[in-house]
Amino acid sequence: MNLETIYDDYLERLQEERKELYKGYEKWFSGSSAGSCYKKQWYKINEFEAEPFDARTKRLLRLGTIVHADFEKAIHEAEPQDNVKVLLEHEVKIPELNIVGHLDHCLLRNDGKNTEIYISDLKTLAQYSWTSKFGRNAKKASINSVQQSFGHYELQVATYALGILKEVMADDLADFNTSKINFDIEQILHNISINIIWYSKNDSKMKTTEISTDALHAALAYWNGLNDFINEDNLIETIPPNGAIGIPMQDWECRYCQHSKICKGS
C-alpha cells in the first residue's frame, strides 16, 4: 500500500469536487486571478485545458485549504455580535466585469442607518514569501518607498470587496461599466475595511494588514483593462510573452503558468 499515492488520489478527487463550485461559470474570470497575465485570463475563459498541478503543489494548496477551514469554523462558532451578519466563503459576482469568486470572511454591521463592512482574506505563506514580506529588508524597503503599489493578493481581496459593495450597497453604486463608478466608490469608502490575514506555514506566525481603499480603484482599473483588451480582439493567441502590456503582468508568472507549454505566440 502506497500511502503517498492514496493521499494524492484523494487530493485529486477534492480538486474535481471544487470545480463544481464554478460549474456554469467556465467563461467567467475568477476573482482570485486578479492581477494575472491577460493571456492567462484569455486561456481560462476560452476553456483551454491547463496543465495539472504536480503532487507537491496540490499538497501545498491543501494545507492552505485546511487552515482556511479552521478559520471559518472558529468564526462560525464565535459568540454572535448584535447587528452583525457573518458571511463565510461567500460567493461574489460582478456580471458587468464577468467576475465570480468566493470571499473568505465578511462582517456586516447595520445600525439601521449605516452599513459597516469588514472584509478579510486569509493567505498562507511559505518561509521565503513571509520573509520577503515581513523580514528586515522588506521593512526597510517599505520605509524607503513613497509609491503605493498593490500585488496579486491585494487586488484579489479588493475585487471581493467590490463584489460585496455591489451586493450590499447597490443603491449607492453606479453600473460598473460607467466612468462614474470611481466617484461613487469614493463616497462610501468610510463604510469599508479591507484586510489580509497572513499565516506563516513555517512557524504559524500571523499578521493582519489593512489594505488601502485605493486598492478598489486599482482592482477596477485592472478588470476594466482586461475586459477592454480581450474585447478588442487583439489576436491574443498569437502574442508571445512580453509581446504586449499585460502579457505577463509580472516576470515570474511564466515560470508557474499552467499554459506555458502552449503560450509561444507566432
Model segments located where?
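Metal-dependent nuclease catalytic cores that hydrolyze phosphodiester bonds in DNA/RNA
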Residues: 1-119, 126-134
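Metal-dependent nuclease catalytic regions and adjoining charged, substrate-binding loops involved
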Residues: 5, 147-151, 162-266
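Short, glycine/acidic-rich beta->alpha junctions
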Residues: 97-98, 151-156
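A short beta-strand motif that forms part of the nucleic acid-binding face
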Residues: 123-126, 200
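A solvent-exposed, charged loop/short amphipathic helix patch at secondary-structure junctions
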Residues: 129-146
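Conserved aromatic-histidine-acidic binding/catalytic patches
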Residues: 55, 59, 63, 145-152, ...
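Short amphipathic alpha-helical face segments that pack within enzyme cores
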Residues: 66, 70, 155-163
